[in-house]
Amino acid sequence: MADTTGRIPLWVIGTVAGILVIGIIGIFFYGSYSGLGSSL
């Protein structure tokens, strides 16, 4: 595995950021298509 010298590995940041972005976009579009996103 990669040597972590106290810092968070860049791939971890990228993975978490990607999951958050996809999750937020997914919830937004799901709410829009469900008719619940109009109030957001």
UniProtKB/Swiss-Prot annotation:
Gene3D superfamilies with a match to the protein in the record: 6.10.250.2070
UniProt membrane topology term: Single-pass membrane protein
Cellular location(s): Plastid, Chloroplast thylakoid membrane
Coiled coil (residue ranges): none
Keywords for this protein: Chloroplast, Membrane, Photosynthesis, Photosystem II, Plastid, Reaction center, Thylakoid, Transmembrane, Transmembrane helix
A single GO cellular-component term on record: chloroplast thylakoid membrane
UniProt cross-references to InterPro entries, sorted A to Z: PSII_PsbJ, PSII_PsbJ_sf
Swiss-Prot/TrEMBL GO biological process terms: photosynthesis
Segments passing through the bilayer: 8-28
PANTHER family linked to this entry: PHOTOSYSTEM II REACTION CENTER PROTEIN J
SUBUNIT field: PSII is composed of 1 copy each of membrane proteins PsbA, PsbB, PsbC, PsbD, PsbE, PsbF, PsbH, PsbI, PsbJ, PsbK, PsbL, PsbM, PsbT, PsbX, PsbY, PsbZ, Psb30/Ycf12, at least 3 peripheral proteins of the oxygen-evolving complex and a large number of cofactors. It forms dimeric complexes.
Family: Belongs to the PsbJ family.
Role played: One of the components of the core complex of photosystem II (PSII). PSII is a light-driven water:plastoquinone oxidoreductase that uses light energy to abstract electrons from H(2)O, generating O(2) and a proton gradient subsequently used for ATP formation. It consists of a core antenna complex that captures photons, and an electron transfer chain that converts photonic excitation into a charge separation.
This protein's name: Photosystem II reaction center protein J
Gene name of this polypeptide: psbJ
